[in-house]
Each structure stands twice: as C-alpha cells, then as structure tokens.
Amino acid sequence: MITFIDDNKDVYTVESICSELPIAVSTYYAAKSRPPSQRQVEDEVLLAEVVRVHAENYGVYGRRKIHAQMNREGFEIGRDRCERLMKQAGIAGVVRGKKPRTTVADEKAERAPDLVDRAWETVREPNRVWVADFTYVRTWAAMVYVAFVIDVYSRRIVGWRVSTNMKADLVLDALEHAIWVRDTELDGLICHSDAGAQYTSIRHTERLGEIGAAPSIGSLGDPIDNAVAESTIGLYKTELINPKRPWRTVDQVEFATFEYVDWFNHRRLHAAIGNRPPVEHETLFYNQQTAPETGPNTNVRALH
C-alpha cells in the first residue's frame, strides 16, 4: 500500500489517496520515516542483480534460470523471492513457439536407419552423437537458411552455417564447421537428422563415411525423432530471431547468429545438463576423465 501511494503521489496528493484507502495519513508518514528493514535492503541489492542477469542473457531468462544463475554467482535467493522481484521489475522469460517445417524429403533417396531411437539420455560423452537440422529467417533482402550441428551430450552447437539457399551445401558446410571445431578423431560418431533431402544426399552420406561417422535418420514427419535439434532451433528462433525482427540483411543474421552461438555455448544455462553452459559441461567431463581414479570406472559408453 505504501508503494502504491508512492507511485501515485505525483498525480494525486497523499491525503486524497489515503482518504480512498484504509490507511491514515499519519500511518503513511510514519512508515516512510522508519529505516528500511534488513530484508528491504537485501531486496534492493537483489533486484538490481536480477535485472542485470536478465539483461545479460538476451532478456530471455525466466524465474528458474535467473534463480539458477544468481545461485551460481553466490547470491542467496529463493525461487519465490526471485519471482517476486522479477514481477517488481516488470521482466519475464520468453515463451517458445513452434518450429516451422523446412524438411522436404527425397522419396527416392536411400535412408539410413535410426541408430538413436530417441535415447538421448544414454549419450554419456561428447562426440558420440551429433544431431543436425536447419531453419529459415525472413529478411528484407532474401530468405535466409541457418543450419546447425549439435552435440547431444553437452547441447553445444559445434557447427553452423548461414546461406540464401537450402541445398546440400548448406548442411555440408555446417558439418565441415563442426569437424573443424572438434579437431579430433570422430570414428564411431553417429550423426542424426531428419529425412530431409539434404541429409540423405549422397554427398552428405559420403562425407560422414570419410570421417568414420554413421548417418542416422529419424522417421519422416515426426519431430520427436530429432528432439534435441528441434529444441535448439526453437530456442534460436524464440531467443534471437523473433524478438529482433525485422531482419534486414543476410549479414545481419549471420553476425547475430555468431554472437548468439557464442553465448549459447559459453554462458546459457541448459536444464538438461544440470543448468550449466555446454562448454562448461564438456570441460567438467574431460576433467573427470583425467582425474585420478578412486573406484571402478562407471562411465559406460551407451551409444557407439
């Protein structure tokens, strides 16, 4: 009630507001003259930090992720308090929409079997399973297509490419980028995608064979079969593309995607990997592999 009076006293007098509310003018001034409580002081500090965390992360974090990031930074704040301060600041997370359909299958192309079978949770190390997909972005200059390659273990975007067409070169360039980024032996890797013609093309299949990787194709028209890629593209559209429309040029989309991927990999918290950024999750994995063993090795490779 005190806050309401403060918010409106520039328009109406304190006396006129109090006459309409169950509060005496003397009570209002007495409350204003009291020093702030410890909790109020803490709220002021935490409110500024909540706003900062929200702004530093594309303005997309909701209560859960702001709460998680605040705790990572050493702030003691509960979820309810975090939600209350977000409401006070007038900020909220974004709501993800549906990914538009871009897949056009080649009915004549031979399709690899589904080697993953939606068993995402059994991938227990990097470079065991990659998933691939692409989406489109409307610009004033042209339609733009953006392809991604994602490591299922860490949710890291390991390769991406922007193009003005959706021919096989688009997904091949994204694959080449991923191979370059990883810079390691990839023998035994599974590269999973939907049944789009770009992914069932001979060139794409042959390139996977050259690096010792096996293609894996989900069923036609079922997005759950490529859920990790679908989720990543959904985040990309919801967190970057849709809020910043209209897009003017191809270069604008490419530069913004570059910045987004850097944030996505190094700073964005992912619930599926313990509210860590992908690069941090991979670093933790490799550190555990080089640490002295204290017991039986329980790191079983589930998909290989």
Give the residues covered by each predicted segment.
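Charged DNA-binding/catalytic regions of mobile-element recombinases
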Residues: 1-304
